[in-house]
Amino acid sequence: MNITVYLGSRSGNRSCYADYAYALGAWIARHGHTLVYGGSRTGLMGKLADGALQAGGQVIGVEPQFFMDEELQHEGLTKLIVTPDMTSRKQQMMDLGDIFLAFPGGIGTLEEISQVMSQVKLHQMEGRFAFLDFDGYYQPMKALIQQMSDEGFVDEDWADAVPFLPSFAALTAFVLGRDLPRPGETWRHFKNHMYRILDLADDAETGETYVVYKTLYGEYRDFIRPLDMFLSEVDHDKYPDVRQKWRFEKTAGLCS
């Protein structure tokens, strides 16, 4: 699957944005997806590409010629597509993507994800989109969309369905199209194994999400295993128990 990410060419005022961008790139690569992005080596864009490439992933950059003239392109990409202008760059990135994510960024990021939302809403393109709302960055956008709905400019059902993903756990569930396990609930795995969910935590270094759970069959033990185990039909024995490597940040965020 191709995941198109829109994000800032600047790094922002807090170092956590760069950490999140790098972890997002690594997450995309480790889950077997191809990253599509704007092709730059600067700011968050460069960190995103570095994370994917260093995790062994495929990265497609789409860069307009005038940025090439300024030598802003990332030199290590799997593929670099050069377009004549920004308009064709945006179209190329939409044509290549299956899922579209808005990471923290500026005016250009808002322009790009807004065009995707409009095209999907008008049934002019297929694909799913979401805002990566790490540390609440896109809460003002969420409030604006709600205001549009309250004032009658967009349908209420559509406004309520726009995804704002606060963590890598939520991103994993969104991409796989599955519900997210929640602390306190009983979870039935595909082999009818029953688990009690105790907690979820993101690994701040890699973006991987882990679930702390207790088995409700056989030996009643606590485990910590990747979220992917709960969202796919794979036996839990295929995933290592990582209780001895607990170093995770809570999903409140790296910026906290």
Mark where each language-model region is.
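Mixed-charge, low-complexity intrinsically disordered regions
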Residues: 27, 177-256
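Small/polar loops that bind or transfer phosphate-bearing groups
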Residues: 36-37, 104-105, 133, 189
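Short Gly/Pro-enriched loop/turn and capping motifs at secondary-structure junctions
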Residues: 107-108, 134-139, 203-204, 218
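A cross-family phosphate/adenosyl-ligand binding-site feature
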Residues: 1-96, 134-168, 172
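Short, structured loop/turn "capping" segments at alpha-beta junctions
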Residues: 59, 124-127
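Active-site/ligand-binding-proximal alpha/beta "capping" segment
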Residues: 88-122, 130, 177-179
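Short loop-to-beta-strand entry elements in the cores of soluble alpha/beta enzymes
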Residues: 127-135
